[in-house]
């Protein structure tokens, strides 16, 4: 299994990137919480990875921290949670925020994530509560509103709003909902990644 990749970032279009590792281009899917930490195109980056093998495709997921990958692996063990839904969850919340929501049984926050209905949220609470010791960080149980945001390092796309909408749709939001989310927080100076981060934050 591929567990770690170090290479040059060739392309990035949320939530996908293309990474050049010794002449081989790896396509990876990243949660937005990891996407925000990417360097500029042409620079080197290191990602922890998880390979999902399906009959129709091999999907490689990338994470900027081992804790993110560990949570991803815990999520896909949960009944009813596949890799794409786990990606959406990790895009909507950081590891700290998700852990806080689980430990404090914040069902209302979980159901706001696309693809997470009441039954799935309840299942997450039952199956994951108390399982975060292995991925605990110093500020692991800080309430989500107090967790510091990570400033993204991004390129400047020509049409950031359209790219933000496309990324939100890839994460499971309906087109109409994604457009509304972006319009509510759209400002001329924001990049697509900043728009995505603000839209996801506002959705919760």
UniProtKB/Swiss-Prot annotation:
Residues 1-64 are annotated as: Domain I. GO terms for biological process: DNA recombination; DNA repair. GO terms for cellular component: cytoplasm; Holliday junction helicase complex; Holliday junction resolvase complex. Its main location: cytoplasm. Residues 156-204 are annotated as: Domain III. It comes from the Bacteria. The keyword Nucleotidyltransferase does not apply. One of its GO terms (molecular function) is ATP binding. InterPro entries: DNA_helicase_Holl-junc_RuvA_I (IPR013849), Hlx-hairpin-Hlx_DNA-bd_motif (IPR003583), NA-bd_OB-fold (IPR012340), RuvA (IPR000085), RuvA_2-like (IPR010994), RuvA_C (IPR011114), RuvA_C_sf (IPR036267). Residues 144-155 are annotated as: Flexible linker. Keywords: Cytoplasm, DNA damage, DNA recombination, DNA repair, DNA-binding. Residues 65-143 are annotated as: Domain II. SUPFAM superfamilies: DNA helicase RuvA subunit, C-terminal domain, Nucleic acid-binding proteins, RuvA domain 2-like. It is found in: Cytoplasm. Belongs to the RuvA family. Homotetramer. Forms an RuvA(8)-RuvB(12)-Holliday junction (HJ) complex. HJ DNA is sandwiched between 2 RuvA tetramers; dsDNA enters through RuvA and exits via RuvB. An RuvB hexamer assembles on each DNA strand where it exits the tetramer. Each RuvB hexamer is contacted by two RuvA subunits (via domain III) on 2 adjacent RuvB subunits; this complex drives branch migration. In the full resolvosome a probable DNA-RuvA(4)-RuvB(12)-RuvC(2) complex forms which resolves the HJ. Has three domains with a flexible linker between the domains II and III and assumes an 'L' shape. Domain III is highly mobile and contacts RuvB. The RuvA-RuvB-RuvC complex processes Holliday junction (HJ) DNA during genetic recombination and DNA repair, while the RuvA-RuvB complex plays an important role in the rescue of blocked DNA replication forks via replication fork reversal (RFR). RuvA specifically binds to HJ cruciform DNA, conferring on it an open structure. The RuvB hexamer acts as an ATP-dependent pump, pulling dsDNA into and through the RuvAB complex. HJ branch migration allows RuvC to scan DNA until it finds its consensus sequence, where it cleaves and resolves the cruciform DNA. This is Holliday junction branch migration complex subunit RuvA. It comes from Mannheimia succiniciproducens (strain KCTC 0769BP / MBEL55E). The gene is ruvA.
